[in-house]
């Protein structure tokens, strides 16, 4: 699924760089916060999905594997106790 999202993003926004994607991520996080403040579950789900898409697109821009990063972070957090 991640590769499909990265491919879609490259086709849809061919001139976007990592900073463009980062700015979009910040925008989507703000929209998630607004949805959470209104406590509307459907909007929260949609905005959380948008945040995830931005994270996947950003990982593609940075040539990093998001799944591997999550696994590494989870392992680090488990070791903290």
Which residue stretches match the model-derived regions?
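Flexible "arm" and connector segments at domain edges
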Residues: 1-48, 52-81
